[in-house]
Amino acid sequence: METLAQHRHARSSAQKVRLVADLIRGKKVSQALDILTYTNKKAAVLVKKVLESAIANAEHNDGADIDDLKVTKIFVDEGPSMKRIMPRAKGRADRILKRTSHITVVVSDR
């Protein structure tokens, strides 16, 4: 049984979150949690939270055994960007893009 959890509009760029997502794709859930715990990146905290939510969903909604779960799919899509302005010299301005991402984790007992 596949179970899904999402975090939409996570305040980190998709490029940075994908670095962490690639570390746990295809791993057993317990091993993935260990990897995320000791990964020194902000995105690791975000992905760990989504993974824990997917585990809880599998246990509560599907009655799955946590020891059998694997991270079958994990993907990170770009979310909407917030546009901000940074003042520059001589009355000019630069645009700053505060990027967001949508993190999706799918766990399965197969």
UniProtKB/Swiss-Prot annotation:
Gene Ontology molecular function: any one: structural constituent of ribosome
GO cellular component, one term: cytosolic large ribosomal subunit
Entry keyword Ribonucleoprotein: yes
GO biological process: translation
Coiled-coil regions listed: none
CDD domains: Ribosomal_L22
Listed InterPro entries: Ribosomal_uL22, Ribosomal_uL22_bac/chlpt-type, Ribosomal_uL22_bac/org-type, Ribosomal_uL22_CS, Ribosomal_uL22_sf
Keywords: Ribonucleoprotein, Ribosomal protein, RNA-binding, rRNA-binding
Tree of life domain: Bacteria
Family: Belongs to the universal ribosomal protein uL22 family.
Function: This protein binds specifically to 23S rRNA; its binding is stimulated by other ribosomal proteins, e.g. L4, L17, and L20. It is important during the early stages of 50S assembly. It makes multiple contacts with different domains of the 23S rRNA in the assembled 50S subunit and ribosome. The globular domain of the protein is located near the polypeptide exit tunnel on the outside of the subunit, while an extended beta-hairpin is found that lines the wall of the exit tunnel in the center of the 70S ribosome.
Subunit structure, as described in the record: Part of the 50S ribosomal subunit.
Descriptive protein name: Large ribosomal subunit protein uL22
Organism: Salmonella arizonae (strain ATCC BAA-731 / CDC346-86 / RSK2980)
